[in-house]
């Protein structure tokens, strides 16, 4: 089912382009991937974008690795059957750390993953204390600890895993206000440190959506670092050098896995991001 919001307050969107454009899929378990998509679109505004989010299995942070791999491969396959893809971005840290090998083995187009921006954070920190704010799953993954050992072994890494922040980010996009008191409670382990992190890695794509609120709660001068801009640059390079010639003249489209009231409430948000319609993807 395709759903279109016909509302006088809906931002006007450009007509369907007549020139074929490379087709890029951005996928996440929820709406956090919109933060990555926004960075890519800023650098590459003239692509055909598909945004898919798994509102049936959200959040992925509490799911098994086997489930995540099978689910992500299934969803990307379903999108690929509808649109030949030039490139896919797995805009979910949890899914990226476990599903990229299976996706790259199955598909001929490039697949870009999202990993915590530990390397740039280690370069930016002045006091040597770097905070990693992520889901509990990302905090526990061996891959995360390998990144720390490789790029930040001279830093003190304060890791904080939270599923509640993911829910707060989703609620914010649905129009709910974010409780700063709740944020203070979640971040209390850092706020009580004698020397808190001066640089914080936003290790979940949902967390840039809470950037303003986090800056109000964290100590003044704290730097927030995420992977969005780096992913956009990587996407641009791959589209130029390695992506297949899969192009479309269709308008941007978003897919959910179930057309729930919550998904329908996201229509105004998705349209502001440039997605003309929202459809249920059969998987």
UniProtKB/Swiss-Prot annotation:
Active-site residues from the entry: 92 (proton donor/acceptor), 204 (proton donor/acceptor)
Binding-site list for substrate: 28-29, 60-61, 93-94, 205-206
UniProt-listed SUPFAM superfamilies: Aspartate/glutamate racemase (SSF53681)
Catalyzed reactions per annotation: L-glutamate = D-glutamate
GO BP annotation list: cell wall organization; peptidoglycan biosynthetic process; regulation of cell shape
Top-rank lineage group of the source organism: Bacteria
Keywords, ordered alphabetically: Cell shape, Cell wall biogenesis/degradation, Isomerase, Peptidoglycan synthesis
Pathway: Cell wall biogenesis; peptidoglycan biosynthesis
Gene Ontology molecular function: glutamate racemase activity
InterPro entries: Asp/Glu/hydantoin_racemase, Asp/Glu_race, Asp/Glu_racemase_AS_1, Asp/Glu_racemase_AS_2, Glu_race
EC number(s) reported in the record: 5.1.1.3
Family listed: Belongs to the aspartate/glutamate racemases family.
NCBIfam families the UniProt entry points to: glut_race, PRK00865.1-1
Role of this protein: Provides the (R)-glutamate required for cell wall biosynthesis.
Protein name, as recorded: Glutamate racemase
Lineage: Bacteria, Pseudomonadati, Pseudomonadota, Gammaproteobacteria, Enterobacterales
């Amino acid at each position: 089912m395709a759903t279109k919001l016909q509302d006088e307050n809906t931002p006007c969107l450009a007509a369907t382009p007549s020139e074929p454009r490379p087709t890029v899929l951005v996928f996440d378990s929820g709406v956090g991937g919109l933060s990555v998509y926004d960075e890519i679109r800023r650098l590459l505004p003239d692509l055909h974008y598909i945004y898919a989010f798994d509102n049936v299995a959200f959040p992925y942070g509490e799911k098994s690795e086997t489930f995540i791999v099978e689910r992500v491969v299934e969803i990307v396959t379903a999108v690929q059957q509808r649109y030949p893809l030039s490139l896919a971005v797995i805009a979910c840290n949890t899914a990226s750390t476990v599903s990229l090998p299976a996706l790259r083995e199955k598909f001929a187009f490039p697949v870009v993953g999202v990993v915590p921006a530990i390397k740039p954070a280690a370069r930016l920190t002045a006091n040597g204390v770097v905070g990693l704010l992520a889901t509990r799953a990302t905090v526990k993954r061996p891959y995360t600890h390998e990144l720390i050992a490789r790029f930040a072994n001279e830093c003190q890494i304060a890791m904080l895993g939270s599923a509640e922040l993911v829910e707060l980010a989703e609620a914010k996009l649905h129009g709910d206000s974010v409780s700063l008191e709740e944020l203070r409670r979640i971040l209390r382990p850092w706020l009580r440190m004698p020397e808190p992190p001066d640089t914080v890695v936003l290790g979940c794509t949902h967390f840039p959506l809470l950037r303003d609120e986090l800056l109000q709660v964290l100590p003044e001068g704290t730097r927030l670092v995420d992977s969005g801009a780096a992913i956009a640059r990587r996407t641009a390079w791959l589209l130029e050098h390695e992506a297949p010639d899969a192009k479309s003249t269709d308008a941007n489209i978003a897919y959910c896995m179930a057309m729930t009231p919550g998904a329908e409430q996201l229509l105004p948000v998705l349209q502001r991001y440039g997605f003309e319609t929202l459809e249920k993807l059969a998987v």
